[in-house]
Curated annotation (Swiss-Prot):
Thermal behavior of activity: Optimum temperature is 60 degrees Celsius for sucrose degradation with UDP and 70 degrees Celsius with ADP. The enzyme remains stable for 10 minutes at 50 degrees Celsius, while addition of ADP, UDP or sucrose enhances thermal stability by 5 degrees Celsius.
Chain positions covered by the region annotation GT-B glycosyltransferase: 271-753
Role summary: Catalyzes the reversible conversion of sucrose and a nucleotide disphosphate (NDP) into fructose and NDP-glucose; although the reaction is freely reversible in vitro, the physiological reaction seems to be sucrose cleavage. Unlike characterized plant enzymes prefers ADP as a cosubstrate, whereas plants prefer UDP. Its preference for ADP over UDP suggests it may directly link sucrose and glycogen metabolism.
Name of the protein in question: Sucrose synthase
Annotated PANTHER family: PTHR45839, SUCROSE SYNTHASE 1 (PTHR45839:SF7)
Subunit structure: Probably a homotetramer.
GO biological process entries: sucrose metabolic process
Organism: Thermosynechococcus vestitus (strain NIES-2133 / IAM M-273 / BP-1)
Family stated for the protein in its record: Belongs to the glycosyltransferase 1 family.
GO molecular function: sucrose synthase activity
Reaction equations catalysed: an NDP-alpha-D-glucose + D-fructose = a ribonucleoside 5'-diphosphate + sucrose + H(+); ADP-alpha-D-glucose + D-fructose = sucrose + ADP + H(+)
Assigned EC number: 2.4.1.13
Keywords, sorted A to Z: Glycosyltransferase, Transferase
Annotated Gene3D superfamilies: 1.20.120.1230, 3.10.450.330, Glycogen Phosphorylase B
Length: 808
């Protein structure tokens, strides 16, 4: 690995500064410095030199520091991990004495990390290495990092070029693909009358002649049998105009293929009738579950997605002319049945999803093993021993409910993605992954110190499951580009799986190919029936507004509300999230407590979790409850804070955002990390100026200073100052609040709707279905490798955790 930036400093007039700075790091207490540590240390160095920190454009050393992700202090040398560009990493050892640069390999870096935590034992043999790179060597690969996350666009270009370069083979593939589609025993698209690709081309032209004399709006049922005699079955369209348009696209594709024509044609093929979404953990339901442990944005995401998916699928099937077959989509969300459901419907096998025709929550119980464990909710960190048998049982249930195998399986989060892998492998269907959040990037050093964290988090299982599922998936949906490969100054969630060590367990030399076309950025939407601008007064219910206004500001109910407001007329500073460490509501409360300027202008209102530790069985939630009380007392926030420990129905949460907006309040999302940020979309579309964490998805939702603001939740004073600056601007110009409010609403409506999301998702599923059918890529070797990791790494550790559960 060439260390270009490091070499440039060594060969420049800043060489002495580099040596002096390196010497300071060498003598410091920290052996492992992350980017923030490095930037702070460099700022201290510049201050000691009585000069400002130079911008990266003006100093080679400053540029090196800016692009350095980690420094490991190792006796007489420093190991520099530099990320000069997105998705590219360089590792070098710098000898402090004479500034000699020695490039390092990834295995050498992983050994060094092991040595740092005293888990390096070369005399006992090598550690197992995971390397998936050989399985991607013969697959098409994106070249430019800017195009990562645009996998389907790349794939369309690749496929259309193959159609052009090798027309005979690829026309045969397309012909074979058109012949395989059926619905409930009915042949679709083409029948046995069309005998070859050449014959297909001839019959398409003949069909276009037949249709040319018919009125464009004539229904398909009127000419169905005439087309059938030419070899065409249902699936081309519902009117003359639609059928003609689809056949013209196919004609163009056969004669002069290009990527846009290919996507337009494949996205019209009726091939998706049954979709299974997998989300085992938490309390998956429609009422009384949000705010429970492990139950939040993912549940909202999936339910909203399903409603929009069904609507889009119905529309697509109708446009395809499958009304003559009475074709209807069916969607199932597969989750876990929890026998002790605590008043929810999570012990009910089937639950119809509101607002749909044929979409259901299907709950399958974990096998019993130890009833003291399996009869109750199980933390997402403890769920791993039950997933394989859950997948076996769920396969039978899915077949029974669908009457068929699903056409597409969508996994959600680490556990759902692993089950999706097991099911897709058994059922031989397309697998899509949605991570929502990869825990490895949320918990600092979670892989390096996995053994210390194992009792609580079981990361050895989760990270192994992630590696298996992400490599096995046919395609992966991420909400943002940075979820895959980060930003110029921070690594992405998937990028963090490229190489890492699990000391004494395994080394990941190459864990994922970031340039694979399997990655696609498809942001979610927001439910516009529930969340809409505060000034849409005719859509708001006055009774709800009055009830919730009292709940937020004045109601005395110690069972579910803590705190009172001495001056309820102050501008509300609002946040709503689960009470866990990563969501960091205690950080917001402490920032509020430290800032007199915020307290003078605002009241803090939190909707979060429970009020009493006795009511929670979640360790993180209990710790955060205790911490929040301690902060309230430490900073004497009595009379300035309201903490509502309640679970709100979705409709109430929508109205609460609007009530806060009525009072020209603001919304703060202070998470230490947020994969996407649905609450940010909900707040913005409601009209609330929104402050979102700069760590994660909000970086792509919010445009800083235009339609919201970034905050750094690790610097509490800075976070408070950012909010205060906006409030001061509002004091100077009352229109400032309106400006940000309006811009936030426009941002959501232009980019984050479920219709955009679902249209894209269905198109992706069809393109990847065609790719898997027609390409010569053999994934079987990759899949066998993933199965080996499952059986040899994952399963023994899952069985050990199960043995532990049996003793409880």
């Amino acid at each position: 690995m060439t260390c270009v930036l490091l070499k440039a400093v060594v060969e420049s007039d800043e060489r002495a500064d580099l040596r002096q700075f390196s010497r300071i790091l060498q003598l410091g207490e920290k052996r492992y410095l992350l980017r923030n540590d490095i930037l702070d240390a460099f700022a201290d160095y510049c201050r000691d030199q009585e000069r400002p920190v130079p911008p990266p454009s003006e100093s080679r050393l400053s540029k090196l520091v800016f692009y350095t992700q980690e420094i490991i202090v190792d006796n007489e040398s420093l190991c520099w991990i530099v990320r000069p560009r997105i998705a590219q990493q360089e590792v070098c050892r710098l000898l402090v004495e004479d500034l000699t640069i020695v490039p390092m390999t990834i295995p050498e870096l992983l050994d060094l990390r092991d040595r740092l935590v005293n888990h390096y034992h070369p005399n006992e043999g090598d550690v197992f290495e995971i390397d998936v790179q050989p399985f991607y060597d013969y697959s098409p690969i994106i070249r430019d990092a800017k195009n990562i996350g645009k996998g389907v666009e790349f794939l369309n270009r690749y496929l259309s070029s193959k159609l052009f370069q090798d027309p005979r083979q690829w026309q045969q593939n397309l012909f074979n693909f058109l012949r395989i589609h059926r619905y409930n025993g009915y042949q679709l698209l083409i029948n046995e009358r069309i005998r070859s690709p050449q014959h297909l081309s001839e019959q398409v032209k003949q069909a276009l002649v037949v249709l040319s004399d018919r009125p464009p709006t004539e229904a398909y049922s009127e000419f169905r049998f005439e087309l059938q005699n030419l070899g065409f079955e249902p699936g081309w369209g519902n009117t003359v105009a639609r059928v003609r348009d689809t056949l013209e696209i196919l004609d163009q594709l056969l004669d002069s293929p290009d990527h846009q024509v290919l996507e337009a044609f494949v996205s019209r093929i009726p091939m998706l009738f049954r979709i299974a979404l997998i989300s085992p953990h938490g309390w998956f339901g429609q009422e009384g579950v949000l705010g429970r442990p492990d139950t939040g944005g993912q549940v909202v995401y999936i339910l909203d997605q399903v409603k929009s998916l069904e609507k889009q699928m119905r529309e697509d099937l109708e446009l395809a002319g499958l009304g003559v077959l009475e074709a209807q989509p069916k969607i199932i969300v597969l989750t876990r049945l929890i026998p002790n459901a605590e008043g929810t419907l999570c012990n009910q096998r089937l639950e119809k999803i509101y607002g749909t025709n044929d979409a259901w929550i299907l709950r399958v119980p974990f096998r019993e093993f130890n009833p003291k464990v399996t009869q109750n909710w199980i933390s997402r960190f403890e769920i791993w021993p039950y997933l394989e048998t859950f997948a076996i049982d769920a396969e039978r249930e899915l077949r029974a409910e669908f009457g068929h195998v699903p056409d597409l399986i969508i996994g959600n989060y680490s556990d759902g993605n692993l089950v999706a892998f097991l099911l897709a492998r058994r059922l031989k269907v397309t697998q899509c992954n949605i991570a929502h959040a990869l825990e490895k990037s949320k918990y600092l050093f979670s892989n390096l110190y996995w053994q210390d964290l194992e009792d609580k988090y079981h990361f050895s299982l989760q990270f192994t499951a992630d590696l298996i599922a992400m490599n096995a998936a046919n395609f992966i949906i991420s909400s943002t580009y940075q979820e895959i490969v980060g930003t110029p100054d921070s690594i992405g969630q998937y990028e963090s799986y490229q190489s890492f060590t699990m000391p004494d367990l395994y080394h990941v030399v190459n864990g994922i190919e970031l340039f694979s076309p399997k990655f696609n950025v498809v942001p979610p939407g927001v439910n516009e029936q529930v969340y809409f601008p505060y000034y849409h007064y005719t859509e708001r219910l006055e009774g709800d507004r009055q009830r919730l206004e009292e709940l937020l500001f004045t109601l005395e109910d110690p069972q579910q509300i803590y705190g009172y407001l001495e001056a309820p007329e102050k501008r509300p500073l609002f946040s709503m999230a689960r009470l866990d460490r990563i969501k960091n509501l205690t950080g917001l409360a402490e920032a509020f407590g430290r800032s007199k300027a915020l307290q003078e202008r605002c009241n803090l209102i939190l909707v979060a979790g429970k009020l009493r530790t006795a009511d929670s069985s979640d360790r993180e939630e209990i710790a955060e409850i205790e911490k929040l009380y301690q902060i309230i007392h430490q900073y004497n926030l009595h009379g300035k804070i309201r903490w509502l420990g309640i679970r709100l129905p979705k409709a109430d949460s929508g109205e609460i955002y609007r009530i806060i907006a009525d009072r020209q309040g603001i919304f703060v999302q202070p998470a230490l990390f947020e994969a996407f940020g649905l609450t940010i979309l909900e707040a913005m579309i409601s009209g609330l100026p929104t402050f979102g964490t700069r760590f994660g998805g909000p970086l792509e939702i919010i445009q800083d200073g235009v339609n919201g603001f970034y905050i750094n939740p690790t610097h509490l004073e800075e976070m408070a100052e950012t909010i205060v600056r906006f409030l001061e601007a509002c004091d100077r110009d009352p229109q400032e609040w309106q400006r940000i409010s309006k811009a936030g609403i426009e941002r959501v409506y232009s980019t984050y709707t479920w219709k955009i999301h679902c249209t894209r998702l269905l198109s992706l599923a069809k393109i990847y279905g065609f790719w898997n059918f027609s390409s010569q890529e053999n994934r079987e070797d990759m899949m066998r490798y993933m199965e080996a990791l499952f059986h040899l790494l994952y399963k023994p550790r899952a069985q050990a955790l199960l043995a532990e559960h049996l003793q409880r």
